[in-house]
Each structure stands twice: as C-alpha cells, then as structure tokens.
C-alpha cells in the first residue's frame, strides 16, 4: 500500500521493481493524472490509484505486507500499524511539519519493532491519521 500517490513517480519505481501497488491519493486531480501517466508508461496493470484519506490506509483490504507513506505524520498512526500483516513493514516520516525522521515499523506477531533511519523532510500527511 502506498499512501500519497502524488505524481505517481514512487508507484512507477515500485512497479518497475515488480511490485503490485495500491496507492491512495487525497487530491482527485492528482490521482487521475497519476493513473493516466502510469498507464501511459506501461504500469497501469500493476498500479491502482484510489482517491481517499490515505492517512487511514485501506482497512477493508488489510492486512498489508508493506505500507509506504510519502507524507509526514506527527506520530506513527496506529490505524496504519493495525493494518500490517505479520512480518509487515511500515515506512513513514514522523515528526514536526518541517523536520522529520524516517521510521520503519515491523510487525512481529502482536509486537511492533520501531527503528529510525535519519532525518528527512516530507509534505504533511493530511487526514484523520495525520495532521488535521
């Protein structure tokens, strides 16, 4: 699951690596443009773009083996960690609006193992699971 489709660049890279991607974008125009671009590039069969509040993931389709968030949250959203499969990984920038740390969360049964992987700056994650 990718949260924050944007231009579709990250989804295209993942598709080129052989991944099937479901991506959620909150801005309808970005979602439409990205889906068209991905189809034009030959990734339309590997990437599905949906419009919605990606900050809450897609709980109806969980569990996910991997959730990649392309926007920063103030904290790791439990609504996303709850959707991880056993052994699943969540990568998300966490912190203040203009200064974050890239965080990896791995589900190990009922436990979550969290590690930080350096500073970064992403746009804010807007929605119920992020900045409101």
What do these predicted ranges mean?
Residues 1-112:
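Conserved nucleotide-cofactor-binding alpha/beta core module
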Residues 98-132:
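Core SAM-dependent methyltransferase catalytic element
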């Amino acid at each position: 699951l990718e949260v924050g489709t944007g231009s579709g660049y990250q989804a295209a890279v993942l598709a080129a690596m052989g991944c099937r991607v479901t991506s959620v974008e909150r801005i309808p125009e970005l979602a439409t443009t990205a889906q068209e671009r991905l189809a034009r590039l030959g990734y339309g069969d590997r990437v599905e773009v949906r419009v919605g509040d990606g900050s809450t993931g897609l709980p109806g389709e969980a569990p996910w083996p991997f959730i990649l968030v392309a926007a920063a949250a103030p904290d790791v959203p439990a609504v996303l960690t709850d959707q991880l499969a056993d052994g699943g990984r969540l990568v998300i920038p966490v912190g203040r609006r203009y200064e974050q740390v890239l965080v990896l969360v791995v589900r190990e049964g009922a436990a979550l193992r969290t590690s930080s992987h350096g500073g970064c700056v992403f746009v804010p994650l807007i929605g119920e699971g992020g900045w409101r």
